[in-house]
From Swiss-Prot:
It is an enzyme of class 7 (translocase). The gene is ND2. InterPro entries: ND/Mrp_TM. It catalyses: a ubiquinone + NADH + 5 H(+)(in) = a ubiquinol + NAD(+) + 4 H(+)(out). It is found in: Mitochondrion inner membrane. This is NADH-ubiquinone oxidoreductase chain 2. The chain crosses the membrane at residues 25-45, 58-78, 90-110, 113-133, 145-165, 186-206, 219-239, 248-268, 272-292, 295-315, 344-364, 385-405, 414-436.
Length: 450
């Protein structure tokens, strides 16, 4: 259905305004999400099924992640369905996003190394074009070129790993490789593939390029590429965690944890701080992957909710900036967070409290589940390290909260548009009432792991 929508809008975007294309496309993706939700039967799917000559594997483990990505895309697209003070309309935005969405939804299902590379490139090339969509911006073009160069290096490493695996096993299908696990060192080369994927995700120590890309790209493009692209890759890694050795994951875990806790202490750029915040969150996700626990799903949900509110809040706060740094990223520095809208400031403060891990926000429950699962699997040192680094990271979260607390209600002529306000209100309500759904959510995750 996504491919059909792409073909239709490829023609429709030529004869229509970008706003109409964005609105129609958002409705199409919402309808796709609804169909996906109504047809999803996780219990009946166990143990799973293969598609397209065993190239893709549909299991109860990757279905919830695909639905989560679809929901995130819908909520991010709501921003482009109405006019804003600093508008960046483009008729190609939705086409590139639909192309990227095909790669995103197929990536967690991949069961073959050839399909893995093809789907990765489908996802990556659309992201390169999305990043450089506004070519009048020098920073946007620079971000797109840097993203393309670093993504090309990671893709080369992926091909190298696939070559070594095929040379040893004689197959590229992951299901067929299961028989080689006990007496072959083919799975050592999957660690090279893991390094390539973590490189593409921007995990430390291979992270400097991603910080630059997120900083140079327009804010609403940064919101998309910093969340959705990482989610698809980490979903595939979690679904195929048995292919990788933990020593590589632990190495990236410790370095990412240290960098994400220390580096933002000296930052005043909000997008850079949120990029390091995402790295800290993915350190928790790496820990849950090592223990292979359903806490992974809970943490992914809270990560999506909190970062969605923060990025949409930045876009909403941009409406009140009278002296923008640029029209592509009006809100850039922390001192600009003094907002005349206390309700918006409250939503941002609530999301930051969730990142800190204050109860009863989702961040508290997600971190509790991840750390409990890690301790049960005897990851004691890793648990102590992540607690210490999270306490250090609290400083820069608290610094942002302090600036937001200085906000005051003022009479202004610029207002947030209704679609963005509705999305922010819905996400904030879900964030605030997350603890009410925890029993049902835990029960559902238990059924997945049976």
């Amino acid at each position: 259905m996504t491919f059909t929508a792409f073909t239709m809008f490829l023609v429709f975007s030529t004869f229509s305004q970008s706003m109409m294309v964005n609105r129609t496309g958002t409705i199409t993706i919402m309808f796709t999400t609804m169909l996906f939700f109504l047809s999803m039967d996780i219990v009946a799917m166990s143990p799973g099924m293969t598609l397209f000559n065993n190239w893709f594997n549909l299991t109860p483990y990757n279905l919830p992640l695909s639905f989560l990505m679809l929901s995130l895309i819908v909520m991010l697209l709501m921003y482009s369905t109405s006019n804003h003070r600093y508008d960046l309309k483009s008729p190609f935005y939705l086409l590139l996003l639909l192309t990227n969405m095909m790669g995103l939804l197929l990536f967690p299902l991949v069961n073959d190394l050839i399909a893995l590379y093809v789907v990765m490139e489908l996802q990556s090339y659309s992201l390169y074009l999305l990043t450089g969509l506004h070519s009048r911006s020098y920073n946007s073009s620079r971000a797109s070129l840097l993203y393309f160069l670093m993504g090309g290096v990671a893709s080369t490493i992926m091909l190298l790993a696939s070559y070594f695996v095929y040379a040893l096993t004689g197959t590229t299908n992951l299901s067929d490789m299961a028989m080689f696990y006990s007496y072959s060192n083919a799975f050592d080369y999957f660690d090279i593939l893991l390094v390539a994927l973590l490189f593409k995700m921007g995990m430390a120590p291979l992270h400097r390029w991603s910080i630059a890309v997120y900083n140079y790209a327009p804010t609403y493009i940064t919101a998309y590429i910093s969340m959705v692209a990482k989610m698809s890759m980490v979903s595939w890694i979690f679904a195929n965690a048995n292919l990788f050795h933990h020593h590589v994951t632990i190495l990236f875990f410790y370095i990412s944890l240290a960098m994400a806790a220390y580096k933002p202490l000296f930052q005043v750029n909000i997008k850079t701080m949120l990029a390091y915040s995402g790295m800290l969150n993915f350190s928790y996700i790496l820990l849950s992957m090592m223990s292979y626990d359903p806490a992974f799903y809970i943490y992914m949900i809270q990560y999506v909710l909190t970062h969605l509110i923060l990025f949409l809040g930045m876009l909403g706060a941009s409406q009140y900036v009278n002296s923008p740094i640029s029209i592509w990223s009006p809100l850039t520095f922390m001192h600009q967070l003094k907002l005349p809208n206390l309700t918006l400031a409250f939503s941002l403060i609530l999301a930051l409290f969730s990142l800190i891990g204050m109860p009863p926000t989702p961040g508290f429950y997600a971190k509790l589940f991840v750390l409990s699962a890690a301790l049960q699997d005897n990851y004691v040192l890793e648990t102590c390290a992540i607690v210490v680094c999270s306490v250090v990271a609290t400083y820069y979260y608290a610094n942002m909260i302090k600036v937001l607390f200085n906000s005051s209600t003022q009479k202004v002529t610029n207002f947030i548009n209704p679609s963005l306000a509705f999305t922010m209100a819905s996400a904030t309500s879900l964030l605030f009432s997350f603890f009410m759904f925890m029993p049902s959510l835990s029960e559902g995750l238990y059924l997945i792991t049976l």
